[in-house]
């Protein structure tokens, strides 16, 4: 999503496109954002990048801020009552030299008048330099992935949408929130999509409202956001994209599934949030004497972003491959270590004082090559250390909870393969947490063509309770299965059983905890998850009972037709899959793998919220307690 990056750069440059190859000093300024703005900016721009754009300070709108009267301020906030009041207060207090007000979503006329009145009252009309609607009310996590919100995400969660006691008004509010973000997304993209969705679902409600909102904007020729120089006019200039709106209820097994690829595992077992992973590291490895206080935990955060080449290359790889690659990178770096020492001595850097590099001038021939090659080598070392720590933390979970065994067993259930161990034995096995066992059983229950008999179910429930499981999620899934059409035709996941290549016995980097012994070296087969199958049918215009009755909307058509018959018979080159009710990295990776083999085609994955299995099972549990 280069468009979002460009839109932010433009905004931080006072809404003027930055001049290419500009050598002049940037204008120094402060950035004032709310939590929504912070969540949009932080996955895309580092503190260093902000500084390069002239941002000397970035502060939360509702924090205590001192006046800096000789510096301009760029605001990036949601147009809420609370935020508008605080901005008016800033004008009255004359905190900054000038004010560039940017709203994440469109501001209403009445709120705009409140700001105008405050500016007049504070005698600050000339200081309010610009007021912009940015239409950036969504969070870009990858070039091809976005999520609606992080703040207040419980308001648009799976639980919120599927509550049995939800009122029509509450449902309208949820749908309007989702539609506002999707509208912003397409304004930023600069494209009007063709919309397809299943009938009788929350996804259909979103489709109807989004179609109406896009249609109304197009009809208002003077104020249409889809004409002229839109930021995104490049990416989809040849053909309009397809928007596939999918309801989470079409597949509840995938979000519960144990996974085997790096990014999805990090999200499943670690604290991974808006592209940042937080790890707890014990200080000191030696064991504490009995009765002594437990060692303090050191908290470390790592950003896993587009600039991390290792992450970009391996985030979709099976975990054993990642472990292997970390080892190879380490060995290749060790071969260059002598070179690093030599370069450091040339540059007069002691030990690990890497901060000194930026202070050095390359005014001698001897230093020139060192200055260019040392930062590259040190960056390589930083990434190796980072991924050694992250992968080691993941590996600890795999080994202590036997996640490879759970992953393989669930794959067999979902692909209807022969099971080598009974489900009761898996639940009774001491390995794995109560939550792991509940996830496994729910996948079995969701995937089975025929629900287990009452006698069998009671046996399973007893085993789950003995294992310490909370049965509330099962109560909800039972109700869901009884009400859903899918009960008669369980979701097919294709034949995806992973192929074991025997056990790992290789010790990874000697002297570290990277020992893969006892972990299955599973090689993934291509999974054909429901979302991927639906996308393939609609993108390639295939006739299939699963998608033949999907509704079709074209906001550019003068009259909205209720037809499910597509006007366009050509396959699509670009598609956006959006899951109403929450998405996950397993689905995202599955779509990325699918599109790799399709030359010239692109897919973006979006969801109303991004949850891991722990967060999802908590929502199912809350629904089951109703």
What annotation goes with each model-predicted range?
Residues 1-626:
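Extended, well-folded catalytic/binding cores that form a central cleft or groove in large enzyme
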